A protein has these predicted regions:
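Condensing-enzyme catalytic core mediating Claisen C-C bond formation in acyl metabolism
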Residues: 1-50, 159-230, 326, 335-345
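Glycine/charged-rich beta-loop-alpha catalytic/anionic-binding loops adjacent to active sites
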Residues: 40-43, 82, 103-115, 159-165, ...
């Protein structure tokens, strides 16, 4: 059976950093909480004047191509997956961001479309592309996101009142671009082993991005206390248990080396590790994180983690990695993959 693999990965991380101390010092209402202690985020990556969704996606895509055997002209498809779609000061929905990227990169034969699924956007794009490769519809493709999302943090600085404010979670975000090229796996050392997503729309109203209720700014309103209950967090391990059981497998037998959770904050990751340990009755793999430096970069967060660890040569050979999305919607699931030759130059 045909399987897909991560052929290459790339990223663009702005050089600018905004510290948690700096961010909260600018709040209209002096905070009665220690955001850094709550989230574990010391700084977050922040767009520079030259950056927008488009430029960050282009830079991430070029980074990915530099690490790839493919050139842009070889790409069969481009899927753009960002939440924000800024080109300059304008937010574009038509024409799609993927068309801008196709022309700029020179991917002249590539079909193209956009997918938006909150912080699970890149997972959704990869899920579609993996299915297309397995079905023989395309041979390869680029999934990319330029996530300029700090606009909601700027709104929260002006409007959030306390830890219970629905805009509180917006204070964790940072900006970054990420890109992945998938193609057909040639062996079991580099392969997507198992990939499934689940959406639970009954919880879709717990996090909504929209214009602010109090200004003309972009904002996100999230009920974190309801989103992060144990009942919600257990959706992931229970789903993975069911999917693995259908293949006659369990978590222990998968022998994961590393796990990457959504970079919302350190306490959130710790809770998911605890829930996973209890649900699977198994110790959790080593947890990879870069949230202390970059914050929650939304749809790019898992892939920024993977990119940074590859760049620093911190992963052992023939690693097996589990990625667990967590997004508004409520979307979760798991991507299990083996990597050996995936590298960042």
């Amino acid at each position: 059976m045909t399987k897909a693999r991560f052929e290459s990965i790339g990223a663009y991380i702005p050089n600018k950093r905004v510290s948690t101390e700096e961010l909260t010092a600018n709040m209209n209402i002096p905070p009665q909480f220690d955001l850094e202690a709550i989230t574990g985020i010391k700084t977050r990556s922040w767009k520079e004047d030259k950056d927008d969704s488009y430029t960050m996606a282009i830079d991430a895509a070029n980074s990915c191509l530099e690490n790839s055997k493919y050139e842009a002209a070889d790409l069969d498809i481009i899927i753009s997956c960002s939440i924000a779609r800024f080109v300059g000061d304008c937010s574009y929905y038509e024409p799609p961001m993927s068309l801008f990227l196709k022309h700029k990169l020179g991917a002249h034969k590539a079909i193209f479309f956009d997918v938006s699924n909150a912080c699970a956007g890149m997972f959704s794009g990869l899920y579609i592309l993996e299915s297309m490769i397995k079905a023989g519809v395309v041979k390869n493709g680029l999934v990319v996101s330029g996530e300029y999302i700090s606009t909601i943090a700027e709104t929260a600085v002006l409007e959030a009142k306390d830890i219970y404010d629905p805009q509180f979670g917006s204070l964790t975000v940072g900006d970054a671009g990420a890109a992945v090229i998938l193609d057909k796996a040639v062996d079991d050392n580099d392969v997507i082993d198992c990939f499934n997503l689940i959406s639970t729309p009954e919880y879709s109203d717990l996090a909504i991005g929209k214009p602010s209720n109090d200004s003309n700014r972009y904002a996100m309103y999230a009920s974190n206390s309801k989103m992060h209950t144990e009942e919600r967090l257990k959706i992931w391990p229970n789903f993975q248990i069911d999917m693995l059981a259908k293949e006659g497998k369990d978590f222990k037998s998968e022998q994961f080396d590393y796990i990457i959770h959504h970079q919302v904050g350190s306490k959130f990751v710790e809770r998911l590790l605890k829930v996973g340990k209890e649900a699977f009755s198994a110790e959790q793999p080593e947890s990879l994180n870069v949230l202390e430096k970059y914050g929650n970069t939304s749809s790019t967060s898992h892939f920024i983690v993977l990119y940074e660890y590859l760049k620093a040569n911190k992963l052992k050979d023939k690693s097996k990695i589990l990625m667990v999305p967590a997004a508004s919607g409520f979307v979760t699931g798991f991507l299990s993959m083996s990597i050996n030759n995936l590298a960042v130059k």
